[in-house]
């Protein structure tokens, strides 16, 4: 596959026949064509003061919603007319004030033009984010925190998918289990992966097999540690990741080699780090 590697820009971390990492800002990147993406699977910053290398995760809530509107608008442009969008976001948050994040981002997406299809509730199982209970053992001001996240399923114009290979690789057992809107599997370890907010490969794997065909193009505009690209590659889909931080691009590359079983020569030996 060495002959398939292309280096057209300093923003392209690597580009092979099946995978592309773009080291760029999702709001300004010019390296994704409009109406070229079959499925977007992503988990954007939650604005809960996580220490990313290259992103301010402590915006005012109004600024966070404006930021979300801007990147969601770009995703809308990139999707094909029968493209889908799996948006992993919190149900709500209490850091910096109680906010209905899931409802607010879904409303913004619909205002942009996305159509709503359904919501999967992800029971993370090992979630542990409690830092306060409000009024302890008192009705004066208790906090209620749901130990779940959402995967909001949106689409651009038509839900029925007619483009692509029309080849599905999902099993009967997977289809029956995953069309149930409650998914239960563990989250990912920050320490193990080396990223402050990784999500498990199982999440994009389910979304990719359920909502796309073999050889479709999958995009993660907040690639992070590369879970979506690994799932895409292992599912015989093309994967594109956008990531503003070069160190996370390198982390994703190393995970693709280790967990995606990518031939290391295809990613390293032709000057990929000269980006």
Walk through the language-model features, giving the residues of each:
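Class I S-adenosyl-L-methionine-dependent methyltransferase module
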Residues: 104-105, 251-275
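Core catalytic lobe of class I
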Residues: 2-250
């Amino acid at each position: 596959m060495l002959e398939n590697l292309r280096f057209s820009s300093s923003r392209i971390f690597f580009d092979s026949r099946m995978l592309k990492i773009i080291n760029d800002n999702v709001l300004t990147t010019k390296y994704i064509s409009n109406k070229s993406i079959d499925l977007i699977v992503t988990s954007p910053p939650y604005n809960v003061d996580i220490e990313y290398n290259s992103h301010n995760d402590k915006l005012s809530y109004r600024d966070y919603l404006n930021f979300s509107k801007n990147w969601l608008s770009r995703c809308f442009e990139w999707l094909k007319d029968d493209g889908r969008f799996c948006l992993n976001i919190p149900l709500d948050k209490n850091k910096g004030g109680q906010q209905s994040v899931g409802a607010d981002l879904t409303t913004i997406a619909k205002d942009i033009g996305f159509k709503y299809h359904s919501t999967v509730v992800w029971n993370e199982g090992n979630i542990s984010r409690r830092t306060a209970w409000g009024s302890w053992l008192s009705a004066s001001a208790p906090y209620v925190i749901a130990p779940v996240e959402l995967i909001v399923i949106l689409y651009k114009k038509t839900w029925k998918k007619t483009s692509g290979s029309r080849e599905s690789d999902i099993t009967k057992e997977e289809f029956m289990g995953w069309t149930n809107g409650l998914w239960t599997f563990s989250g990912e370890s920050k320490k193990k992966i080396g990223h402050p907010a990784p999500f498990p490969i199982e999440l994009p794997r389910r979304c990719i097999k359920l909502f796309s065909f073999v050889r479709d193009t999958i995009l993660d505009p907040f690639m992070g540690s590369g879970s979506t690209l690994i799932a895409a590659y292992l599912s015989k889909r093309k994967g594109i990741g956008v990531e503003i931080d070069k160190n996370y691009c390198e982390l994703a590359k190393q995970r693709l080699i280790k967990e995606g079983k990518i031939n290391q020569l295809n990613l390293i030996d032709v000057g990929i780090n000269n980006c």
